[in-house]
């Protein structure tokens, strides 16, 4: 959690600090990812059980507490898995670089890069579909920016090569995000029928 403010106020310098640290996966998950991933889960739980999804046409879909809780647990697990998958993707893509970082370092990097996406979950307190999409898009752009800033120093490569690596990673990340969003829509939109 100590890097959250720095990722927004001075991201270039903060990425260099993160790269110099030798944080373990367990420490990173317990002190950053588990807490940050809880933000969208808790906000979505409150928003969908107390206010309900607003589709903009006056239709509101409210979930029961039990359904909301079951879906929140699934949503949380999917987000934690998403960070692990992206860490693995970065590690796999870096296989041909002479200074290949460890899998643990790649997962830590992926967790910090995902911070804007986690924080964008605050908007789920008022689950208006177009507002969630807008805030999520802005968060995705900033996540891409953090990726472009961090990859060159993370892999010790030049900015041109970093741009290529970051673009590939971002493309895979967007694909993973789309899968997560599809699962989220299915779980939060239709999950009440499953539970």
UniProtKB/Swiss-Prot annotation:
It is a multi-pass membrane protein. It is found in: Cell inner membrane. Its main location: membrane. Pfam families: Yip1. Keywords: Cell inner membrane, Cell membrane, Membrane, Transmembrane, Transmembrane helix. Residues 56-64, 131-134, 193-195 are periplasmic. InterPro entries: Yip1_dom (IPR006977). Residues 1-32, 88-107, 158-169 are cytoplasmic. GO terms for cellular component: plasma membrane. This is Inner membrane protein YohC. It comes from Escherichia coli (strain K12). The gene is yohC.
